[in-house]
């Protein structure tokens, strides 16, 4: 009888420990880290975002609203380049001598990210996943500097990505972003076709980034305070 009672108590204790471990999935408010990748320009002097890809680096900060949603600040530094020789178009000003540029670009983007599944270590009783895909969109600012002129303009970043929780505090992310700028002068030339246009995105330049990032999570949430238990 005593042996059976002790066995029952031991079983209850083990189940309690397992349940506590299963629910032990800390959530953190903030992440900070860095990223590296490539940047490519698409505009009048480069017909494909896969041409002339240049290295870039970034600083990444993220505020986690909940396991599905977060806000991300991404500040990237890179290069964009292109040439009139890269496209088949005719440019009146460069009919005899080709035009080429190699500009430095700084981008600051603030986006809203939505995870398709709840993001976590996978130990959480809510069924959080350590690997999740996500989509995002927001607003950004672009500063491009080169030999022709310096340009400051707004951009609209849209993209997709995936992130993996390596450990409780360490995260790896991969994302691709297309930045639709509101300027046609990131390449240093406005309207090389000499054709008038109108509208916010009429004949404007864009650029894309492919980035791998590593971030560290901190500032744990009080789950009782946030009524998450």
Regions found by a protein language model. Give the residues of each.
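Short glycine/proline- and aromatic-enriched beta-strand/turn motifs that initiate or cap beta-hairpins
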Residues: 21-62, 211-221
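Gram-negative (and chloroplast) outer-membrane scaffold detector with strong preference
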Residues: 67-148, 216
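Residues that define the transmembrane beta-barrel architecture of outer-membrane proteins
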Residues: 28, 51-55, 104-108, 131, ...
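Outer-membrane beta-barrel translocator domains and adjoining extracellular loop/strand segments
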Residues: 45-49, 84-90, 123-127, 147-152, ...
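Outer-membrane beta-barrel channels and translocator barrels
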Residues: 27, 64-68, 117-119, 165-167, ...
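Bacterial Sec-dependent N-terminal signal peptides
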Residues: 1-27
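Predominantly the C-terminal beta-signal and adjacent terminal strand-loop region
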Residues: 105, 167-229
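Residues on the lipid-exposed face of transmembrane beta-strands in outer-membrane beta-barrel proteins
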Residues: 34-38, 59-63, 110-114, 137-141, ...
């Amino acid at each position: 009888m005593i042996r059976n009672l002790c066995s029952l108590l031991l079983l209850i204790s083990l189940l309690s420990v397992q349940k506590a471990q299963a629910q032990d999935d800390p959530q953190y408010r903030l992440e900070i880290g860095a990223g590296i990748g490539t940047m490519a320009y698409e505009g009048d002097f480069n017909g494909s975002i896969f041409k002339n890809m240049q290295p870039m680096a970034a600083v990444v900060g993220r505020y986690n609203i909940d396991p599905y949603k977060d806000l991300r600040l991404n500040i990237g530094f890179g290069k964009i380049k292109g040439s009139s020789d890269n496209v088949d178009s005719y440019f009146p000003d460069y009919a005899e001598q080709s035009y080429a540029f190699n500009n430095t670009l700084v981008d600051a983007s603030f986006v809203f990210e939505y995870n398709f599944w709840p993001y976590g270590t996978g130990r959480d009783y809510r069924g959080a996943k350590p690997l999740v895909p996500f989509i995002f969109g927001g607003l950004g600012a672009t500063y491009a500097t080169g030999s022709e002129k310096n340009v400051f303009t707004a951009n609209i970043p849209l993209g997709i990505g995936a992130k993996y929780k390596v450990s409780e505090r360490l995260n790896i992310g991969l994302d691709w972003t297309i930045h639709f700028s509101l300027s046609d002068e990131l390449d240093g030339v406005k309207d090389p076709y000499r054709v008038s246009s109108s509208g916010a995105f009429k004949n404007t330049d864009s650029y894309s980034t492919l980035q791998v990032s590593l971030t560290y999570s901190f500032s744990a949430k009080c789950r009782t305070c946030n009524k998450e238990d």
